[in-house]
């Protein structure tokens, strides 16, 4: 029930109510949402308020508008697990999805100063650059750019990276044991290239994940940069507070960096 005496806008209250109905399974992915007219009559609000709530949820990715058909509950967002070191292929398979990669670039290059520093290399040390568009059920979900020191896995530039997990390849063929990744998460928007690649609107909210993966010897073995669709992903974090406010080895940590 909406509280008309609350300072919280009615459209926002209605949007939260609809999200709760989705969360509880009262309305399911693929179900058609009630019309503006029915929602306005049901909650004794104006059609404009109902329209605002629907538009808000559509922008959030909870609803999807289908031209000439109406508004429907969107498929749930994929949860990117940051607590366990999984590649995209492993993550999607764990969720029961079908992971596909389109390799846009796979070659040996010299690293930029930023990549060289993160991988503890000189700028004349060759790295394998792999750029892949990652899809699930034919929907582009993320654009991933990866740099791996060429000496770590000889021949990586010739591997079929459209059909296999990089992490599995590094562990099985490269003999590495991956331990952890240091990552940063940042809100961004789709530029012209990304909007065309993903088939989304220019300026659509996106998520930028950057980081470095290390092996059991704390040696950097991968620098990665991934652009995720903001309407299809959410990220899972877990934090534990230290009573003494000291670092606690082995626990995931979340930090905030002000730009």
For the regions a language model picked out, list residue spans one by one.
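Short, hydrophobic-biased segments on the C-terminal half of alpha helices
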Residues: 54-55
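Extreme N-terminal segment that seeds HTH/winged-HTH DNA-binding domains in transcriptional regulators
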Residues: 1-47, 83, 253-259
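Extended, compositionally biased flexible segments
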Residues: 47-48, 58-59, 65, 83-94
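Beta-hairpin "wing" of winged helix-turn-helix
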Residues: 26-31, 58-68, 72-74
């Amino acid at each position: 029930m909406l509280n008309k005496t609350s300072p919280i806008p009615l459209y926002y209250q209605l949007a939260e109510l609809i999200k709760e109905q989705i969360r509880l399974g009262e309305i399911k992915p693929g179900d058609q949402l009630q019309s503006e007219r029915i929602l306005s009559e049901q909650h004794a609000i104006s059609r404009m308020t109902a329209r605002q709530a629907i538009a808000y949820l559509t922008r959030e990715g909870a609803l999807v508008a289908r031209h000439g058909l109406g508004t429907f509950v969107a498929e749930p967002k994929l949860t990117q697990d940051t607590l366990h070191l999984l590649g995209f292929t492993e993550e999607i398979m764990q969720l029961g999805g079908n992971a596909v990669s389109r390799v846009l670039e796979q070659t040996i290059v010299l690293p930029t100063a930023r990549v060289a520093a993160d991988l503890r290399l000189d700028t004349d040390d060759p790295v394998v650059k792999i750029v892949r568009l990652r899809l699930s059920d034919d929907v582009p979900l993320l654009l991933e750019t990866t740099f791996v020191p060429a000496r770590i896995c000889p021949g990586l530039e010739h591997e079929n990276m459209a059909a296999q997990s990089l992490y599995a390849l590094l562990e099985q063929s490269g003999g590495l044991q991956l331990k952890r990744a240091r990552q940063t998460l940042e809100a961004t928007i789709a530029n012209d290239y990304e909007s065309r690649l993903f088939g989304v609107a220019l300026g659509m909210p996106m998520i930028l994940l950057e980081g470095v993966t290390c092996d059991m010897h704390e040696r950097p073995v991968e620098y990665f940069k991934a652009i995720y669709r903001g309407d299809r992903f959410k990220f899972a974090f877990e934090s534990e507070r230290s009573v003494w406010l000291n670092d606690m080895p082995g626990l995931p940590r979340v930090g905030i960096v002000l730009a």
